[in-house]
Swiss-Prot record:
It comes from the Eukaryota. GO terms for cellular component: mitochondrion; TIM23 mitochondrial import inner membrane translocase complex. It comes from Dictyostelium discoideum (Social amoeba). Pfam families: Romo1. GO terms for biological process: protein import into mitochondrial matrix; protein insertion into mitochondrial inner membrane. The lineage of its organism: Eukaryota, Amoebozoa, Evosea, Eumycetozoa, Dictyostelia. Belongs to the MGR2 family. This is Reactive oxygen species modulator 1 homolog. InterPro entries: Romo1/Mgr2 (IPR018450).
Length: 128
């Protein structure tokens, strides 16, 4: 039985296979995090320098390094988040493991066809 393709997987040149999508997810997370972190780092430095009224030469050195540090740090966190949210292509797993569906049916049929009854009357007693 063939599985339907996911939406957007028709054109492999644009999206690529599942591994490429995972790498793209990590890259996109890193870039978004780097942009947000650099902006946040710049805002913090600008507020700090406005409050202390320091010279502009020190501002330029500190602004660049702070933006790079905050952008890199937050970009790494967002890249890790993109890696954690990476989807696994289930069609490849099911093709490799043909007994996967069979095992699930066996487990469900065991529970549905079980003729054992449990005596739960001792649990119904309420004590106040």
């Amino acid at each position: 039985m063939s599985y339907p393709k996911r939406y957007g997987q028709e054109n492999n040149r644009v999206l690529g296979d599942a591994n490429n999508q995972c790498i793209q997810s990590i890259k996109m997370g890193f870039l978004m995090g780097a942009g947000v972190g650099a902006t946040f780092g710049s805002c913090i430095v600008l507020i700090m320098f406005a409050a202390k009224k320091l010279p502009r030469a020190i501002l330029m050195k500190t602004l660049g390094s702070s933006a790079m540090k905050m952008g890199g740090m937050f970009g790494c966190f967002m890249g890790i988040g993109g890696a954690l949210r990476c989807e696994v292509d289930e069609t490849k797993i099911n093709k490799n493991n043909k007994n996967n569906n069979n095992n699930n049916n066996n487990i469900h049929s065991f529970f549905k066809n079980s003729n054992t009854e449990y005596d739960i009357s001792k649990f119904n007693k309420t004590k106040f």
